[in-house]
Amino acid sequence: MNTESDRPYPAWVPARGFQLRKAGVQFDAVRVDGDDGRALADGLARLTAGDPGPVVEEANGRRSVYFLVPPASTAYRPWPPDVTRLTSGPGRIAYIPVPALNGCTWPLSWRHRPRGGDLVHTQLLRSALFAR
């Protein structure tokens, strides 16, 4: 049986709507709320020629922006106090909202869509956060 997919996007992206993905499996996330998160995503896009890695934004509530990073890549480093790390570990479980690429996914959408298997570069994200 052929288990490879012909999908042009990662298998963790749902076909429709949105789903919660457990942190630490395919990725972790760094959440930055409000306009700060949007400005950070746009700044990373400029630094990476338009491809910062997958970034999800939320349209309501805190208007959170989720930067999808490699699993466990945020550990053992200081982060700014206004940042939330969504990771897993002993006694810790977190879930990350992931929208489909098309269709009705409100209140979630892709600020930057996933391309291939690349995620947001954790050190670049961290450096950009401290440079604000």
Go through each PLM region and give its residues.
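Signature for HUH/AEP ssDNA processing cores
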Residues: 1-61, 70-75, 87-132
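"Short basic amphipathic alpha-helical interaction patches in structured regions
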Residues: 79-85
